[in-house]
Amino acid sequence: MRAYLDLVRVPGVVNVTASQLFARLPLGMLSLAILLHVQGLSGSYAQAGAVVAAVSVGQAVAMPVTARLAGRLGVVPTLSVAALVSGASMLALAFAGSSPVLLMTLGVLIGASVPPLMPVVRALYPKMVAGEGVRALFALDTTAQELIWVVGPVGATFLASAVSTAAPLVLSAAVTVLGTAWFLLSARRLHPGVAAGRSSFGRVLANRTVILAMVTSLLLVASFMALEVGIVAELGRDGVTAGAAIAVASVGSLIGGLLLGHRRLGIAWVVAALAAVAIGTALFGVVDNLALQFVALFFSGLGFAPAMSALYLFVSREVAEHSATEAFGWLNSGALVGGAVGTACAGVATEAHGSIGAVTVAALLATLAACCPLVARAAGPIGGVTDRTADAVSPATPPMR
């Protein structure tokens, strides 16, 4: 844990990390908030689901573009405009009528204007710390973001029931704008400049490390979302039990990230972490005792954050600075696509075979994710696995420039 203590002593690290997590908090609220609000307006879960899907599509399509703009035009103008447009769109949806066309349009606009904070901050991490500190910072970020998916849905549900269904959307708009402003003020000493590189849009996808990270994270997120469907189908008779079960997996991911994420994880360790996810997921489908199911879910979560942080670190080391934001934008889009694919496949499997169908889909997807690094390594060397700038760099990292 010393690696994390060294991190918090670096001036600005805590402020930057906390501000970007706060600004991204609405991502954990939006899906449920929009579902509850649109269903209340229209009386249709189908229409509400379509608007939520429109948000996901807008974000998946636009994120690589806005992330690239942050690297080309500058972080401050890109994030500022995106936050203002996204916040205004959320407010518009909160007070819009029940017109399906208007709601769908606002859904796409909300998704397309989500500030590319994740790509930007992960491209900036190597500028904040050096040597082993980068590894620990990626681990801390990946682990801490679990809080978004724990706090967000709870906050959305509470506000919708205690105040109104518009309340979580209004809060999301405020947090997006204020959180982005906080992040920009916190990161101002980094002086992010406009990238000088001239690579064409999408060229970063020719990098084998980026492809590996994107495909693996897509499958891993798809597995987790499919598992959520299986958990709800199996334990959904009591909403509290299902929610607690999902939280147990998230706690496992958080603990796994804290204990393992900052360590030197090569390809073999990444495969082992992904295999743990697959094994834990499969065990959840096999055991029929609630306590054992919780243990299996905790075990499945242990490998999630360490594997994701290692993949992000590989990409950070491998891609050129001027392509970093776009690369992480593609990873974000891959994760969004994975979530949609996992949920859809698990839904079909649940209709046909019950909860075991969704869990089987989740286990298969996690197994495929574990195979990806092995296939990539068999095809040739994977860049970014080792630090080319020398692991000898002292972990006592300099303050932000």
How would you describe each model-predicted region?
Residues 61-75, 160, 255-269, 350:
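Helix-to-loop junctions at the C-terminal end of transmembrane segments
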Residues 21, 100-116, 218, 293-306:
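Hydrophobic core of transmembrane alpha-helices in multi-pass small-molecule transporters
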Residues 2-60, 204-249:
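Helix-loop boundary and gating motifs at the non-cytosolic
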Residues 34, 115-129, 306-319:
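Intracellular juxtamembrane helix-capping segments at the cytosolic ends
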Residues 84-98, 276-288:
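C-terminal ends and interior cores of transmembrane alpha-helices
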Residues 268-311:
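C-terminal transmembrane helical hairpin of 12-TM major facilitator-type secondary transporters
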Residues 322-355:
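A late C-terminal transmembrane helix in Major Facilitator Superfamily
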